[in-house]
């Protein structure tokens, strides 16, 4: 099966001139130039054909990866369903055993025999049951979808799976997919040609070996396609090993899980639309990061933690230990009609039940196969890759052990809004669970900001004319300095007046003088906690003379910055193994620490004693903020709740329940609004006394930090997607957006609202000047 390469590499490139032995063979300069030009044109044509061949192979490899991810999710669903059904059978057997003794003797014998007969299911019976269900579902879909879907030989839609609870449907699907292993992937490729030019620069497909069925399916292809593919796979396997080695060297045991999900060379053109519009010119498919599956919860987190490790990559977790509450991948997107952030879940509806689970597929699989989690059939899913911009750069590092969440994060395209560091402006509606009729405002453009009323109705927000203009509203931000800390920067804070920046990494806080931009070295280094423990939060007292530092240790360090050499003047010890966040009361008398055990510790800074603990969070408390008058405290936790506390009475006031873990929050200095950043990539802005809220959708991954400007008119959020977003309070008009080279784990805004500092996973902090 060796492919004839004569078409691609003809042996005789140019017709030979007639042989004239009697006449000497001479070239003039003009003829030589013509021949060189001719040769160049030929090489150019050869290059073009090779380039097309390469693109074709790359696109087919991407298709293979999508199918692999689909099978991965399907096998996971089958495994869960199998265990579920086994548990149900066990319980029913126990009930039968308890009930049978109450029957009469003759009935007991009959029932026992009937139970034994019921347990004896033959393969013939199983095949008949599966065949009947398969036929019924084929017929139902033939009526429901009159237009044949080309990737299927008969034009019939494969059996859809109504829910994970249908084991027969799952079995039917698996057998159907096995039987249709000859589907022509190459034909499907035509449906994607318009996307490949755009995609090939940024999605690098992982070197996953195709399954046997797909190898059989591709026999009709030219043999060299696969030989080229196998060579490419071997090369990529080496690349993967090299990539993991280099990541380990630069990120300390792969602490930063997110550095590989963006291509540094991705296009960064300016956005082609007005930022005040709540949407874009081109309506697109819904797209969203995948729910995090249990196999990759640790590896998909984004700020350091001492607790969890991902065994498959020996990778430290970088969030406050992110947990799933159920064995199935969590669908953490708030949905219209469900009171996702109400004070309590609606009685009768189990928490976590999301009717639009299907819209949160782990990857925008461009074939009409449903996944085991009830994917809603969508016309655009058939052969339409929803990843818009850079989409061929980082499936390269996805191994079979990694979850679909990682694949989705890698395939997620970037969305650009601002002239700061613009990039691909198509965000493709990364809005989970929003019906198609809500994907735009009257101008016909998809929206990213939605108002959610008390009854759960979602409507795109029409921005007012002054959304992005007026006093106190920035125009953009300019990067003016980079502070090379040397470790992942998990905490930053700015002094008042704006002169020093404090960056917290592993085992120390470094102090930088930003009044001299040319100064590339820290003015001092404050060693605290243990050398291997990450600083998670550092807070300055309003007088600027005291710094409090907390992190992956049970102690908080209090630093005296007014001394000739900064020194630790006290340490506060709690029972929790880690502190995730700190807040200081306006009068500087009290410090609040978010503990990994879910408690909020209240410290008397004068007497250096623990005076109280607020108990309520059932998992780690991850973020905190305090009202300007010092009477109310807001905390967010990994238990999917945000709680408010009355500091005068020492009791909990409110509780807001979400379907996703809370990673960051900020309370507006002017009151009324609370912004919450979540694991599911949403930012929600809640009114503190009314049930209304806004839901904002520009982040591609976990929202790791959030901070309000001191004027209260705008706020910033940062995420695992490398983005710094600035939003208008409260409705979330995008003011500007900047993209960094790695996960942005922390941020702070100066008291005069003129500077922003961010800390990132590539071991540096970045200083921005806010331009008004």
UniProtKB/Swiss-Prot annotation:
Keywords: Nucleus, Repeat, Repressor, Transcription, Transcription regulation, Ubl conjugation, WD repeat. It comes from Xenopus laevis. InterPro entries: Groucho/TLE_N, Groucho_enhance, WD40/YVTN_repeat-like_dom_sf, WD40_repeat_CS, WD40_repeat_dom_sf, WD40_rpt. The gene is tle4. Residues 1-24, 183-359 are annotated as: Disordered. SUPFAM superfamilies: WD40 repeat-like (SSF50978). This is Transducin-like enhancer protein 4. Residues 184-203, 216-253, 274-290, 307-316 have a biased composition (Basic and acidic residues). GO terms for cellular component: nucleoplasm; nucleus; transcription regulator complex; transcription repressor complex. It holds the Pfam family WD40. Belongs to the WD repeat Groucho/TLE family. It comes from the Eukaryota. GO terms for biological process: mesoderm formation; negative regulation of canonical Wnt signaling pathway; negative regulation of transcription by RNA polymerase II. Interacts with tcf7, tcf7l1, ripply2.2/bowline, dscr6/ripply3 and foxd3. Associates with tbx6 in the presence of ripply2.2/bowline. Interacts with EFNB1 through the SP domain. CDD domains: WD40 (cd00200). Expressed at high levels in the spleen and ovary. WD repeat Groucho/TLE family members are characterized by 5 regions, a glutamine-rich Q domain, a glycine/proline-rich GP domain, a central CcN domain, containing a nuclear localization signal, and a serine/proline-rich SP domain. The most highly conserved are the N-terminal Q domain and the C-terminal WD-repeat domain. The SP domain is involved in EFNB1-binding.
């Amino acid at each position: 099966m060796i492919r004839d390469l004569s078409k691609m590499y003809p042996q005789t490139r140019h017709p030979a001139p007639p042989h004239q032995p009697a006449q000497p063979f001479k070239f003039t300069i003009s003829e030589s130039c013509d021949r060189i030009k001719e040769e160049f044109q030929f090489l150019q044509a050869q290059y073009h054909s090779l380039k097309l061949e390469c693109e074709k192979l790359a696109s087919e490899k991407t298709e293979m990866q999508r199918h692999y991810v689909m099978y991965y999710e399907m096998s996971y669903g089958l495994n869960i369903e199998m265990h579920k059904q086994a548990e149900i059978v066990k319980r029913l057997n126990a009930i039968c055993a308890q009930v049978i003794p109450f029957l009469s003797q003759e009935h007991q014998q009959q029932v026992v025999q009937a139970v034994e007969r019921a347990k004896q299911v033959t393969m013939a019976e199983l095949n008949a049951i599966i065949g009947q269900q398969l036929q019924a579902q084929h017929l139902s879909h033939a009526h429901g979808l009159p237009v044949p879907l080309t990737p299927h030989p008969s034009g019939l839609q494969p059996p859809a799976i109504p829910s994970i609870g249908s084991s027969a449907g799952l079995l039917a699907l698996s057998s159907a997919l096995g039987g249709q292993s000859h589907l022509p992937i190459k034909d499907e490729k035509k449906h994607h040609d318009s996307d490949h030019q755009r995609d090939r620069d940024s999605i690098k497909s992982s070197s996953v070996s195709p399954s046997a069925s797909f190898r059989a399916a591709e026999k009709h292809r030219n043999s060299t396609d696969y030989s080229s593919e196998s060579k490419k796979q071997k090369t990529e396997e080496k690349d993967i090993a090299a990539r993991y080695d280099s990541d380990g060297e630069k990120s300390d045991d792969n602490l930063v899980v997110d550095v590989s999900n963006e291509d540094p060379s991705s296009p960064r053109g300016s956005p082609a639309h007005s930022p005040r519009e709540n949407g874009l010119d081109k309506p697109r498919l819904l797209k969203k990061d995948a729910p995090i599956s249990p196999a990759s919860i640790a590896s998909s987190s984004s700020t350091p933690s001492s607790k969890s490790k991902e065994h498959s990559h020996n990778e430290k977790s970088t969030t406050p230990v992110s947990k799933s509450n159920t064995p199935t991948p969590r669908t953490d997107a708030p949905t219209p009609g469900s009171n996702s952030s109400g004070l309590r879940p609606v009685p009768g509806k189990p928490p976590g039940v999301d009717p639009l689970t299907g819209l949160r597929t782990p990857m925008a699989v461009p074939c009409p196969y449903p996944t085991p989690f009830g994917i809603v059939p969508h016309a655009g899913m058939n052969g339409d890759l929803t990843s818009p911009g850079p989409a061929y750069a980082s499936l390269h590092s996805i191994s079979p052990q990694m979850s679909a969440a990682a694949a989705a994060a890698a395939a997620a395209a970037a969305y650009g809004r601002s002239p700061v560091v613009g990039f691909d402006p198509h965000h493709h509606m990364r809005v989970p669970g929003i019906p198609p009729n809500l994907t735009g405002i009257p101008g016909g453009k998809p929206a990213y900001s939605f108002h959610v009323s008390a009854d759960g109705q979602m409507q795109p927000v029409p921005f007012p004319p002054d959304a992005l203009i007026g006093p106190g509203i920035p125009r953009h931000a300019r990067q003016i300095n980079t502070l090379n800390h040397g470790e992942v920067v998990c905490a930053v804070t700015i002094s008042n007046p704006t002169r020093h920046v404090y960056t917290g990494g592993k085992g120390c806080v470094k102090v930088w003088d930003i009044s001299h931009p040319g100064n590339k070295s820290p003015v001092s280094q404050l060693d605290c906690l243990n050398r291997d423990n990450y600083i998670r939060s550092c807070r300055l007292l309003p007088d600027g003379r005291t710094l409090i530092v907390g992190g992956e240790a049970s102690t908080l360090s209090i630093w005296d910055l007014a001394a000739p050499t900064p020194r630790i003047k006290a340490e506060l010890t709690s029972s929790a193994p880690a502190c995730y966040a700190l807040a200081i009361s306006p009068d500087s008398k009290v410090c609040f620490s978010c503990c990994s055990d879910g408690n909020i510790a209240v410290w008397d800074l004068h007497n250096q004693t623990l005076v109280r603990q607020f108990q309520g969070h059932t998992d780690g408390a991850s973020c905190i903020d305090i009202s300007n008058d010092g009477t109310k405290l807001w905390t967010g936790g990994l238990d999917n709740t945000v709680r408010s506390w009355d500091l005068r009475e020492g009791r909990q006031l409110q509780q807001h329940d979400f379907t996703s873990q809370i990673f960051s929050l900020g309370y507006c200095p002017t009151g009324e609004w609370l912004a919450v950043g979540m694991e599911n990539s949403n930012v929600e802005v809640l009114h503190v006394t009314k049930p209304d809220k806004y839901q904002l959708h520009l982040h591609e991954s976990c929202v790791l930090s959030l901070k309000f400007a001191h004027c209260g008119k705008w706020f910033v959020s940062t995420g695992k997607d490398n983005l710094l977003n600035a939003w208008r309070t409260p409705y979330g008009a995008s003011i500007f957006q900047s993209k960094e080279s790695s996960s942005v784990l922390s941020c702070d805004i100066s008291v005069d609202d003129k500077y922003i500092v961010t800390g990132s996973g590539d071991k540096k902090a970045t200083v921005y000047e806010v331009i008004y």
